[in-house]
Amino acid sequence: MIKAIDTIVAQATAPGRGGVGIIRISGPDVEAVAKVILGKVPKLRFAEYLSFSDQHNEVLDQGIALFFKAPNSFTGEDVLELQGHGGPVVMDMLIKAILSIKNLRGANPGEFSERAFMNDKLDLAQAEGIADLIEATSEQAAKSALHSLQGEFSEKIEQLVESLIYLRIYVEASIDFPEEEVDFLSDGKISKGLYQIIDNLEAVKKQAKQGAILRDGMKVVIAGRPNAGKSSLLNSLVGVERAIVTDIAGTTRDVMREHIHIDGMPLHIIDTAGLREGADEIEKIGIERAWQEITTADRILFMLDATTTSAEDPRQIWPDFIDKLPKSVGLTVVRNKADLTGEAFSMTENHDHPVYRISAKTGQGVDLLKEHLKDIMGYQGHTTSGFMARRRHLEAIDNAQRHLLEGKVQLEEYKAGELLAEELRLTQQYLSEITGAFSSDDLLGKIFSSFCIGK
């Protein structure tokens, strides 16, 4: 347990008027605060209805007091919670009275959670789960954040780390005892253990990607030539008319963004200017911005006017566009105006690209497209949600995976035990960054400073 010098105080409930306002105090001088504000130290883990007074015994409010003794508290320190009336003036008066006591100061953003982390009450991924639960914008995201808070993500990472430690011991034993008759590097046990870790890490990576989408949303860019129906599709997905729609090519000249949820799954839908040569200066700027969005998208909805072509292969339709796309960006072909061509509103696969036939104007086939977007995001319906993940988690997993695969090369091609051991060590180091078992002070400061004050 890390011993704190300061005792900190902050309002734990949101600022503003409310029926109840909660003030949280944590640190070594909590009992001194209780004696001043309450006139006594409350009974441990027992709700007492008391008056809240200042140092001059003037009553400021009355409510419930809860006292938790270290280490049995959220922060692992002595903690006092005062639950009073939620008016901003009352809260401010009470906090000022508490701050007038020696060794008290206002808490920094996320400092209560940081102290909980430092005192091993929760790991870094769980601490981030608190912030993600508070900031969740959908039911699915809230459930996933709760699973992270409850340690589901951390447990998977710890299982991987334990497997790595066991494998490292075996590899390093083969290095330290070369005189043994058994060739540890060739007996199959190391390769079997390594392949199992590679498979398990890939499974966790897939879940983490879904968790990151739940937290940050999936960026879907609608792109195509002018007058293909891009703005009509945006309006249909959003459910209201956000974009101006006309028969004039080039009506959309700038990027338009809308944030929507499809069954709790967050999407950032981006409508872009029609891509063409020979546009005027204003439209050219819009096209440049469109390409900026396209290259950073998670998914491209490639819009076609079905009345102008029967082709479905995007490379056949517009090879230059496909060549400019980053390989990491997924593509879905959308044949719009199928109501005019008589095509069935359906989906087929063509050269690894799904093709959807819709009418953005009438909305026919759009529900099928929505189901497609949900599937891409890993929608799980009413089944148990996965865990929440952040971009730093994905980066750590990517780095760990890179070193793990390099270790596989060292084992299979070179039988280099020392280099394999080093790659396993680096893999473990990156995975341990996720839970905070191995993290720099700069990283911790950046993470906790993004939390709410009082958390």
Swiss-Prot record:
One of its GO terms (cellular component) is cytosol. The lineage of its organism: Bacteria, Pseudomonadati, Pseudomonadota, Gammaproteobacteria, Alteromonadales. Its cofactor is K(+). NCBIfam families: mnmE_trmE_thdF (TIGR00450), PRK05291.1-3 (NF003661), small_GTP (TIGR00231). It is found in: Cytoplasm. Binds 1 potassium ion per subunit. Keywords: Cytoplasm, GTP-binding, Hydrolase, Magnesium, Metal-binding, Nucleotide-binding, Potassium, tRNA processing. It comes from Psychromonas ingrahamii (strain DSM 17664 / CCUG 51855 / 37). K(+) binds at residues 227, 246, 248, 251. Residues 217-378 form the TrmE-type G domain. This is tRNA modification GTPase MnmE. One of its GO terms (biological process) is tRNA wobble uridine modification. InterPro entries: G_TrmE (IPR031168), GTP-bd (IPR006073), GTP-bd_TrmE_N (IPR018948), GTPase_MnmE (IPR004520), MnmE_dom2 (IPR027368), MnmE_helical (IPR025867), P-loop_NTPase (IPR027417), Small_GTP-bd (IPR005225). HAMAP family: GTPase_MnmE (MF_00379).
